[in-house]
Amino acid sequence: GLFDIVKKVVGAFGSL
């Protein structure tokens, strides 16, 4: 769902 996409984006930023 949309929330899954949001979490994926947040995870990507967290990897920075």
UniProtKB/Swiss-Prot annotation:
Keywords, alphabetical: Amidation, Amphibian defense peptide, Antibiotic, Antimicrobial, Fungicide, Lipid-binding, Membrane, Secreted, Target cell membrane, Target membrane
Taxonomic superkingdom: Eukaryota
Name of a matching Pfam family: Antimicrobial20
Subcellular location: Secreted; Target cell membrane
Keyword Transferase attributed: no
Modification note: C-terminal amidation enhances antibacterial activity. This increase may be due to stabilization of the alpha-helical structure at the membrane interface.
Leucine amide PTM positions: L16
A Gene Ontology term for the protein's cellular component: extracellular region
Family matches, as InterPro entries: Aurein_antimicrobial_peptide
Membrane-spanning residues: none
GO molecular function terms listed in the Swiss-Prot or TrEMBL record: lipid binding
BP terms from Gene Ontology: defense response to bacterium; defense response to fungus; killing of cells of another organism
Tissue: Expressed by the skin dorsal glands.
Function per UniProt: Amphipathic alpha-helical antimicrobial peptide with moderate to potent activity against Gram-positive bacteria, Gram-negative bacteria and fungi. Also shows a weak activity against biofilm of both Gram-positive and Gram-negative bacteria. Probably acts by disturbing membrane functions with its amphipathic structure. Kills fungi via membranolytic action. Enhanced sterol levels in lipid composition membranes reduce interaction of this peptide with membranes, having a protective effect against the lytic ability of the peptide. Shows anticancer activity.
Subunit (UniProt): May be monomeric or may oligomerize as homodimers or homotrimers in Gram-positive and Gram-negative bacteria mimetic membranes.
Assigned protein family: Belongs to the frog skin active peptide (FSAP) family. Aurein subfamily.
Leftover remarks: The primary structure of the mature peptide is identical to that of aurein-2.5 from Ranoidea aurea (AC P69019).
Protein name (Swiss-Prot/TrEMBL): Aurein-2.5
